[in-house]
Amino acid sequence: MKKIFSLLFLLVTCIAQAQNVYRTDKDISYVSGSETDTYRQERCKLDIYYPENKKDFSTIVWFHGGGMEGGNKFIPKELREQGFAVVAVNYRLSPKAKNPAYIEDAAEAVAWVFKNIEKYGGRKDHIFVSGHSAGGYLSLILAMDKKYMAAYGADTNFNIKTLGED
């Protein structure tokens, strides 16, 4: 009986692990290949952390904090292995960049996600934008002022809902 229980436990564990395989693609540029600004080429990159064997998943675009003066992209541990993708974005920082450069970078990154997430298995109608501190500010500006997203050809006909709304 112990052997059967042990084998059954091992089988269930292996199946559970097989369902939770994640991949991270790092340092993907979200700016045009013809970009000539070296600082922009250096900073405007993103990492995509996504479930490899799952389709039609949601995606969170995550902007790091740092007061627009510091910080680097990272995948928060709280968002890992939750069944959705996380796109961590770097953007230009002050003093090398001035407002609204970081907002424009954020908009271009989100537009890139809208245009490309289906290639990774995600749904482009299930993209959420969030961040910490300065990253939260960038998320809010993109939600409130659609001109930034429109400048990069992203469909700005989306609804902003709070958690719990249908």
Where are these regions (language model features)?
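Catalytic nucleophile-loop/oxyanion-hole region of alpha/beta-hydrolase
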Residues: E35, N72, V89-K124
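Primarily recognizes the serine-hydrolase "nucleophile elbow" in alpha/beta-hydrolase
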Residues: K115-D166
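Solvent-exposed loop/turn segments at secondary-structure junctions
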Residues: G66-E69, L93-P95, S133-Y137
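N-terminal cap/lid segment of alpha/beta-hydrolase-fold proteins
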Residues: Q19-K55
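Short beta-strand element of the alpha/beta-hydrolase
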Residues: D56-G65
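Bacterial Sec-dependent N-terminal signal peptides
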Residues: M1-R23
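Extracytoplasmic/secreted proteins, especially bacterial periplasmic and envelope-associated proteins
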Residues: S58, E81, A101, D105-E108, ...
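Short amphipathic alpha-helix adjacent to the substrate-entry channel of hydrolases
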Residues: N72-V89
